[in-house]
């Protein structure tokens, strides 16, 4: 076992994943890779947002192919039914490189790439002691020497190939040298049996030349092949949820909860995808929560929005209210320092999984990410009216619970008087976008649903308290109608049934049920609010 050659870490890491309660078998991807061995089209680059299982797949592929692996690890998985399973499992020299790893006290590209170069040469020297290897030779020359004398080939599995481009010490010249390193290591080399590479951004973003044009690239937005192997599909989440019900004493999560919180992504063919890490975390914890953990500035929503706040401000307000924004997405998104136009910014956010794209429109994928957007809105002052409204939202909630309609009206009127650009109030969609902002803090204590089926119709907003002894809120909006009309609709349509439960059942919620009506008169440009306990 070496540092890179036939390293046992991928095997051990994949075994750990397999031992988990909520494991999904994705080994059928091997059926698509095995036929490519030693063929001309044997170079694959898979790009996906973070947390979509790229590293798990890379570990699995390395664990399957590398010599000395225990074949028993895969005997109960889908790949074991493949006719070439026994012929291919555990029979190959595998070079596994995680490009996100660095040596201790790394301050330069030379130190970074030197670790990889020296480690590979050392591994090969130990694996082939019968060959006189000059440790000062380039690794591609050493590998060529091994192939010439033994005929042995190597499978390359490379994870996070683009991590180097985000390292602070890497210069533009270093980036060029890195691409040259990969070219000299892989391109046109007979010793390459297969090359499988993963990253967030595609090769074409960084290389407009021919350095790595031997790779076939597969992204989530435009390429169908391999799409089912990254992220969880509907049927896979169905199976995981059934397992959850069988093994959890007091399940707190519904199947619809998983869809609302962690769905929202799509393959190029339109199939729905779930964030795999978040689904597993939620089922393991038996709790819906925001498991989106930022791993750096490129996962930060504001990193992108800050490049053009003025153009994106209104779209952000609408997207937070659940609207979809028409736009054109570039297949190869610009890296953060280059972002200027709205299209470039949205393209980058789609690539990093912060927005999703479907049928020519971008939108916030799910409730998990909605929480990240909400936190940003309350933090970033440069967002202007969004920040101001978000930070008076706690007052709006307290006024609502106290039935203080005078304060409620003042806050809504303040939103109007600050000349929020989106407030043309031509329809209830735009009014609801602002209501989302002025009730932003309510999301800390409530699960806020918009346009949800309740009773005999659809309610504009319904606030489910996290604690069952808290007050419940039903909110209806009206343009050119009175707030009394809104409350009358809440009563007439029996929206309160959402909180009262079925006949003969004990009510889950024990607090008050408050009906809230908010209206806007286009002629007088005035708002009115009413709160009534029902």
Regions inferred by a protein language model and the residue ranges of each:
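Structural motif
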Residues: 155, 471-473, 514
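Active-site metal-binding core of divalent-cation-utilizing nuclease and nuclease-like domains
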Residues: 145-150, 438, 443-468
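Domain-level recognition of nuclease-like catalytic cores that cleave nucleotide substrates
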Residues: 502, 508-534
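Phosphate-binding site recognition
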Residues: 1-427, 442-444
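Mg2+/Mn2+-dependent nuclease catalytic core
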Residues: 175-180, 479-497
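Metal-dependent nuclease catalytic cores in nucleic-acid-processing enzymes
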Residues: 184-188, 347-355, 436-441, 489-513
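Conserved catalytic cores of phosphodiester-cleaving nucleases, focusing on short active-site segments
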Residues: 435, 459-463, 471-479, 493
């Amino acid at each position: 076992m070496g540092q890179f050659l036939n390293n046992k870490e991928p095997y051990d890491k994949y075994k750990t994943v397999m031992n988990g309660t909520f494991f999904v078998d994705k080994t059928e991807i091997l059926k698509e890779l095995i036929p490519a061995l030693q063929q001309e089209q044997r170079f694959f680059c898979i790009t996906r947002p973070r947390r979509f299982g790229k590293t798990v797949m890379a570990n699995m592929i390395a664990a399957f192919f590398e010599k000395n692996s225990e074949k028993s690890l895969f005997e109960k998985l889908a790949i074991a039914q493949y006719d070439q399973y026994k012929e291919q499992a555990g029979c190959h020299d595998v070079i596994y490189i995680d490009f996100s790893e660095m040596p201790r006290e790394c301050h330069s590209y030379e130190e970074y790439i030197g670790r990889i170069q020296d480690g590979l040469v050392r591994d090969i020297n130990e694996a082939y002691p019968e060959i006189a290897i000059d440790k000062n030779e380039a690794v591609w020359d050493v590998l060529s020497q091994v192939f010439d004398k033994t005929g042995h080939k190597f499978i390359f599995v490379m994870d996070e190939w683009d991590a180097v481009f985000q390292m602070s010490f890497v210069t533009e010249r270093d980036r060029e040298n890195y691409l040259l390193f990969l070219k000299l290591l892989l391109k046109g080399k007979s010793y390459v049996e297969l090359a499988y590479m993963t990253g967030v951004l595609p090769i074409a973003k960084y290389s407009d030349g021919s350095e790595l044009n031997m790779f076939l690239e597969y992204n989530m937005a435009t390429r169908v092949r391999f799409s089912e192997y990254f992220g969880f599909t509907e049927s896979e989440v169905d199976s995981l949820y059934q397992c959850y019900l069988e093994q959890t004493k007091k399940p707190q999560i519904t199947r619809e909860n998983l869809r609302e919180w962690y769905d929202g992504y799509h393959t190029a063919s339109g199939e729905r995808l779930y964030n795999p890490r978040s689904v597993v975390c939620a089922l393991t914890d038996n709790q819906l929560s925001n498991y989106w953990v930022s791993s750096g500035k490129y996962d930060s929503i504001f990193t992108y929005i800050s490049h053009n706040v003025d153009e994106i401000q209104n779209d952000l307000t609408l997207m937070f209210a659940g609207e979809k924004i028409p736009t054109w997405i570039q297949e190869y998104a610009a890296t953060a320092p280059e972002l200027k136009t709205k299209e470039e910014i949205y393209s980058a956010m789609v690539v990093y999984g912060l927005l999703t794209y479907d049928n020519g429109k971008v939108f916030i994928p799910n409730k998990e990410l909605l929480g990240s957007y909400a936190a940003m809105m309350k933090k970033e002052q440069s967002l202007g009216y969004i920040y101001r409204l978000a930070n008076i939202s706690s007052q709006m909630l307290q006024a609502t619970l106290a039935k203080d309609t005078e304060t409620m009206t003042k806050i809504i009127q303040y939103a109007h008087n600050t000349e929020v650009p989106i407030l043309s109030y031509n329809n209830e969609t735009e009014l609801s976008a602002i209501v989302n902002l002025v009730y932003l803090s309510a999301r800390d204590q409530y699960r806020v649903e918009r346009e949800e089926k309740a009773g005999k119709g659809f309610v504009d907003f319904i606030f489910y308290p996290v604690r069952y002894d808290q007050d419940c809120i039903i909110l209806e909006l009206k343009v050119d109608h009175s707030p009394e009309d809104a409350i009358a609709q809440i009563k007439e349509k029996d929206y309160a049934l959402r909180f009262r439960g079925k006949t003969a059942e004990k009510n889950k919620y024990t607090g008050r049920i408050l009906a809230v009506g908010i209206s806007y008169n286009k002629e007088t440009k005035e708002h009115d609010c009413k709160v009534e306990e029902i």
